[in-house]
A protein has these predicted regions:
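A noncatalytic interaction/capping subdomain that flanks phosphate/NTP-handling catalytic cores
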Residues: 1-90, 100-111, 116-225
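Conserved lysine of the Walker
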Residues: 94
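Hydrophobic positions on the alpha1 helix immediately C-terminal to the Walker A/P-loop
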Residues: 97
Length: 225
């Protein structure tokens, strides 16, 4: 299914219009600085609920970034009561790596496998579960302080290094909602989220194989074992 949408903004209101192949149309609106978004055509008959899920996710992000919170395309593991967030392009191996944690690191569990939220609360960076978890049904209404964020890339070896602040922002930015780059105010809000998180959490780059040794390396580096 191909999602086709147009994102418009007036001075006071964001509008998201989604149309599917049969021209069923969903319209969502959110006022600037509001904490609510609404679907204006809730009576539309359409059995494809992916459009509703996408629209709610998109508009929720508009509300969230104004509160120093944003969705991140990532897979998040919880270990020792803290969250570790793994980023990467689709197909890089995020889900594989977090599965290796669960199989090889005692006490490691999955928080979300596709679109968790990150934010800053009471001076700490926090990862939140969400109803959007990709192909893995992991919908947890839980949150944990973030221990570290890791950008993954495939390699014929396992090697991990910590990134400097500017590199860290560059590692995170591609994993946040890309459409926000076309709206100056939303882009600024996203950068505020990234700056706040990076100032509180170490960000790493892990070049790795899809093996248990990679999971052990990232765990030991992050938790100082």
């Amino acid at each position: 299914i191909t999602l086709k949408y147009m994102f418009l903004r007036s001075e006071e209101e964001y509008i998201l219009t989604i149309k599917n192949a049969t021209c069923a149309q969903h319209i969502f609106k959110c006022k600037r600085n509001s904490t609510e978004c609404v679907q204006t055509n809730a009576g539309v008959v359409d059995n494809d609920y992916s459009f509703l899920r996408f629209g709610v996710w998109f508009m929720l992000n508009i509300v969230a970034v104004q509160k120093l919170t944003a969705a991140v395309h990532s897979s998040v593991i919880v270990c020792h009561d803290e969250a570790v967030m793994f980023l990467g392009e689709s197909g890089t191996g995020k889900s594989t790596h977090t599965r290796l944690w669960r199989e090889n690191i005692e006490g490691a569990t999955l928080l979300n496998d596709d679109s968790p939220f990150i934010g800053v609360r009471d001076g700490r960076a926090v990862a939140y579960g969400s109803p959007w978890s990709g192909k893995t049904p992991c919908y947890k209404n839980e949150n944990y302080p973030i221990r570290a964020i890791v950008r993954l890339s495939q390699a014929p070896h396992n090697k991990m290094r910590q990134l400097r602040s500017l590199q860290a922002i560059g590692a995170l930015l591609p994993s946040l909602p890309p459409a926000f780059a076309f709206d100056e105010k939303l882009e600024d809000a996203v950068m505020n989220v990234l700056s706040a998180v990076v100032s509180k959490v170490p960000v790493y780059h892990l070049e790795c194989l899809p093996d248990a040794a990679a999971a052990q390396l990232s765990h030991d580096t992050i938790f100082g074992v």
